[in-house]
């Protein structure tokens, strides 16, 4: 099961517009990837043990590195570029140039493949949000 949306953002989906920067990487101007990486971290921090933008690996306009520890205690170094996110190492701040892993368009898709506990946390957050919307609708 791929989860390509953040349950915390469901209430803002009505503001979704064609061509918006929120639609992903295609068709947008070059971004500062460090800022993009910070946004990625803030989106999914609730569903992992630890996640932060690397301070020791070079960030630039076109690339940033994110360290993540899943709830299963597996550590990864992720590369964020205009192409998306991919695993580049199996430890914090580690880049293995020989590692061949696929790019994922979203952090949700990437974590969905790496962490069953992420899927569970995402599903629980989604359920809580839907229950809150239901309660608000009944008031």
From Swiss-Prot:
Gene3D superfamilies registered for this protein in UniProt: Hypothetical protein (hspc210)
Tissues with expression: Detected in heart, brain, placenta, liver, skeletal muscle, kidney, testis, lung and pancreas.
Organism: Homo sapiens (Human)
GO cellular component: cytoplasm; nucleus
Region (Required for PRKAR2A interaction): 41-45
GO terms, biological process: intrinsic apoptotic signaling pathway in response to oxidative stress; negative regulation of protein kinase activity; positive regulation of canonical Wnt signaling pathway; regulation of Wnt signaling pathway
Official protein name in the record: GSK3B-interacting protein
Modification comment: Phosphorylated by GSK3B.
Family: Belongs to the GSKIP family.
Record Pfam families: GSKIP_dom (PF05303)
Compartment annotation: Cytoplasm; Nucleus
Sequence segments annotated as region (Disordered): 1-22
Biological role: A-kinase anchoring protein for GSK3B and PKA that regulates or facilitates their kinase activity towards their targets. The ternary complex enhances Wnt-induced signaling by facilitating the GSK3B- and PKA-induced phosphorylation of beta-catenin leading to beta-catenin degradation and stabilization respectively. Upon cAMP activation, the ternary complex contributes to neuroprotection against oxidative stress-induced apoptosis by facilitating the PKA-induced phosphorylation of DML1 and PKA-induced inactivation of GSK3B.
Chain segments carrying region Interaction with GSK3B and acts as a GSK3B inhibitor: 115-139
Keyword tags: Cytoplasm, Nucleus
A GO term, aspect molecular function: protein kinase A regulatory subunit binding
Annotated site residue numbers, Required for GSK3B interaction: 130
Subunit and interaction comment: Forms a complex composed of PRKAR2A or PRKAR2B, GSK3B and GSKIP through GSKIP interaction; facilitates PKA-induced phosphorylation of GSK3B leading to GSK3B inactivation; recruits DNM1L through GSK3B for PKA-mediated phosphorylation of DNM1L; promotes beta-catenin degradation through GSK3B-induced phosphorylation of beta-catenin; stabilizes beta-catenin and enhances Wnt-induced signaling through PKA-induced phosphorylation of beta-catenin. Interacts with GSK3B; induces GSK3B-mediated phosphorylation of GSKIP and inhibits GSK3B kinase activity.
